[in-house]
Amino acid sequence: MTVTADPVTLMKQEVGKAAAALVKSGSIVGLGTGSTTAYTIQYLGDRLKSGELTDIVGIPTSFQSEVLSKQYGVPLTTLDAVDHIDIAIDGADEVDPQKNLIKGGGAAHTREKVVDYLANQFIVVVDSGKLVDRLGSVFAVPVEVIPMAITPVTNAIKQLGGKPELRMGVKKAGPVITDQGNFVLDVRFDSIDDPVNLEKILNNIPGVLENGIFVNCADIVLVGEVKDGQPLVRQL
C-alpha cells in the first residue's frame, strides 16, 4: 500500500527543495533550524550524492541542523574556519511585509542570527500561515537570558510593557535550555510598532543574550501554500 504525504508536508518539501536549488557549487552555506529547513538539508544531501552539487560546506545553527547534516551527508565547518558565508537558509515564525522576522520557536535564534546576518544572501523558507501584517500578531518574541538574570530581565521586560513567560520543556521537566545553556522568555507585546527599535532595547537589557526579532536581513522569502490540494511555492 502506498502512503501519500499530506499536502502540508508536501508543501514544506517543495519549499525546502526550492531553497536547496538556489545553492551553487563551492558555496559556504548557513543551515537553519526547523521542519522546513530540514527538507532543505535533505535535498542538499541529495544534490551532493547525485553529483549535481559539489564542494559545499555547511555551518549549522543548532544541534538539530548539525545532526541532520551528518545524516544526509552535508559536510560541515565552523565560523572559525571561514571568512564569509555565501548563502543562509532558515525558517521563521512570522514574516511581515518588510520581510522582518520573528524567529526562535526552536530556541536556536541566537546562533541563527549570527549566521543569517553574516550571509551574503539570506533565504527564508516559510508556509503562508507565517505571513503577518505586523510582527507579534501571533507569535511571541523569544528572548534568550542567562539563568542568573532571569528575574531582573523579567522585571525589565514588564516595565517595557511586555508579558514574559518562561518557556517550559516538552517531555522534559523544567524550562527549555538552549544550546548555549540559557533560558528563553517568550514575550508578548500588545503591539510591535517599531521592531528595529524593540530589537535594540531588548538586547540592551543586562542578562539578555539575544532576541528573536530579525530586521533588515532577509533577501528572499520563499512561501509555501496549498491550493486546491496542491503544494505551491511563491517568492516575496
From Swiss-Prot:
Keywords: Isomerase. GO terms for biological process: D-ribose metabolic process; pentose-phosphate shunt, non-oxidative branch. Its EC number is 5.3.1.6. GO terms for molecular function: ribose-5-phosphate isomerase activity. Pathway: Carbohydrate degradation; pentose phosphate pathway; D-ribose 5-phosphate from D-ribulose 5-phosphate (non-oxidative stage): step 1/1. Substrate binds at T33, G34, S35, T36, D90, G91, A92, D93, K103, G104, G105, G106, K130. One of its GO terms (cellular component) is cytosol. It catalyses: aldehydo-D-ribose 5-phosphate = D-ribulose 5-phosphate. Homodimer. This is Ribose-5-phosphate isomerase A. It comes from Trichormus variabilis (strain ATCC 29413 / PCC 7937) (Anabaena variabilis). The gene is rpiA.
